[in-house]
Design a protein with these regions (language model features):
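Secreted/periplasmic carbohydrate-active enzymes, especially glycoside hydrolases
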Residues: 1-153
Length: 153
């Protein structure tokens, strides 16, 4: 196993990142195993409608990397604090090389519980990658809050 450490230039300070102040292994390094096909990355978009700020708008983009025999399926479930699924979707993963980019259609949630500092309402997103027999091969997730920040007249 090899670990490559970069030393950045003094110009890296423009991005205000600490990589120009530090070099070497300064943080924890993790090594973990993944299945042959796995969820490499995902982006959640959770905002409120622009008219009344009551309806939640949920979007999800996922990158699946690797390849698997047969047809894999990607599923998500958005659950409230009681564990009740309020959104669910499942689609087949079409193998198009080693990286597959999947975008789910935006979904609307009426009367969503909004997130704020005073009322930090969070939903749980569960992502599951299943093999052709329906067995879960990779599972991940995160907490999701619905809010909108904007500047307007």
């Amino acid at each position: 196993m090899a670990l490559e450490v970069y030393r950045w230039s003094a110009g890296s300070y423009l991005e205000c990142q600490d990589m120009w102040r530090l070099s070497g292994i300064e943080r924890d390094v993790y090594l973990y195993s993944t299945p042959r096909q796995f969820i490499a990355d995902y982006k959640v978009t959770s905002s409120l409608d622009k008219k009344e700020y009551k309806e939640g708008i949920f979007g999800l983009d996922i990158t699946v990397e690797g390849s698997a025999a047969g047809v894999s399926t990607l599923a998500y479930s958005l659950e409230d604090t009681a564990g009740k699924a309020i959104l669910q979707n499942e689609i087949p993963v079409k193998n198009r090389g080693l990286s597959n980019f999947i975008t789910f259609d935006e979904q609307s949630l009426p009367d969503v519980k909004r997130w704020s500092a005073e009322h930090p309402n969070l939903y749980t997103l569960i992502l599951a990658l299943k093999d052709d027999a329906g067995h879960i091969t990779h599972l991940t997730g995160c907490k999701v809050g619905f809010r909108t920040s904007e500047i307007k007249d």
